[in-house]
């Protein structure tokens, strides 16, 4: 498995400097842009890897999942990933039922959960970080569903 942090010469840490990431991304884009190399497959593969790495590292949920995967926990694989706990399901259900489901509240909840994920990753408590990340992903999915519903 590729370590996307290594690709950008960043420490494998949840808290990264997003400005540095973006700056390095644009430098790589200039250097490895497919238009510069035509059919050279190595450069095209490098460009694809850079885009994938940037997408993962620039998104805190995907970044946390990547760190966990590097440490042997795959929260993206439905077969082996921890499941959303009953308390989270009940909390979201109650929010929906009461009409208290707002994008602002969900965003704040996700932010709070990601702070917990960051702490647990920093302490190398990967199992707890994975469980909290699953919760954060569930709230993120609920937030996306809410946004879609508002547009329809």
Question: Where are the predicted features?
Answer:
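C-terminal accessory/regulatory regions appended to core domains
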Residues: 1-152
